[in-house]
């Protein structure tokens, strides 16, 4: 085990530029209920799981740098040497490395949401919006199979907390640069589901 030498904390906010959908469990099957609810805390407030952020950033970095997964496996890189493996952990059991990166769950800034998104309306506080989507019949030109999507509306802000641990022989500057690059790639992509339909455009502040 290499000697631990320090830790860098990277904090900020995640700002939703478009509605965000990260799926949660469907607790009830009532008629007219939501087909695709978002993940929420036990208090019913939406949040962004750290696992969703970490997995997406890793995927984008691997895509940019041309990592080729093993045929038919789709597994992430497991070399144990590159910045991606050092930050996120090597997938291969033969090259196990300590994951340097921690990304915490990101929780909603409720005060900002009520003031800026709900415009101070506290009589009926709801932290999500519903969007009906459907499929167009290519022959008839009519909408079919409508479904109700739940999402967190644009303008919401979530607290972003992360840290990178450093060990002897680490290229500290390179690890930091790679992580920040991953966050920038995410700003140019999308987080969560339905990104090709406009969901999940975010900005880090």
Regions found by a protein language model. Give the residues of each.
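RNA-binding basic/glycine-rich loop and surface signature characteristic of RAMP-family CRISPR effectors
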Residues: 1-205
């Amino acid at each position: 085990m290499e000697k631990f030498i320090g830790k860098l904390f990277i904090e900020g906010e995640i700002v939703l530029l478009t509605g965000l959908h990260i799926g949660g469990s469907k607790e009830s099957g009532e008629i007219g209920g939501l087909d695709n609810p978002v993940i929420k805390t036990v208090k019913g407030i939406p949040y962004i799981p750290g696992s969703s952020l970490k997995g997406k950033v890793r995927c984008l970095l691997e895509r940019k740098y041309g990592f080729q997964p093993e045929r038919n496996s789709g597994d992430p890189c497991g070399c144990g040497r590159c910045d991606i493996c050092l930050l996120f952990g090597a997938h291969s059991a033969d090259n196990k490395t300590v994951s340097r990166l921690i990304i915490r769950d990101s929780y909603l800034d409720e005060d900002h949401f009520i003031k800026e998104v709900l415009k101070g309306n506290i009589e009926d506080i709801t932290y999500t919006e519903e969007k009906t989507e459907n499929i167009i019949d290519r022959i008839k030109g009519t909408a079919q199979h409508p479904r109700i999507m739940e999402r967190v509306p644009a303008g919401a802000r979530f607290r972003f907390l992360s840290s990178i641990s450093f060990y002897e022989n680490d290229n500290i500057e390179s690890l930091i640069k790679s992580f920040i690059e991953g966050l920038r790639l995410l700003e140019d992509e999308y987080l969560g589901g339905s990104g090709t339909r406009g969901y999940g455009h975010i900005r880090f502040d």
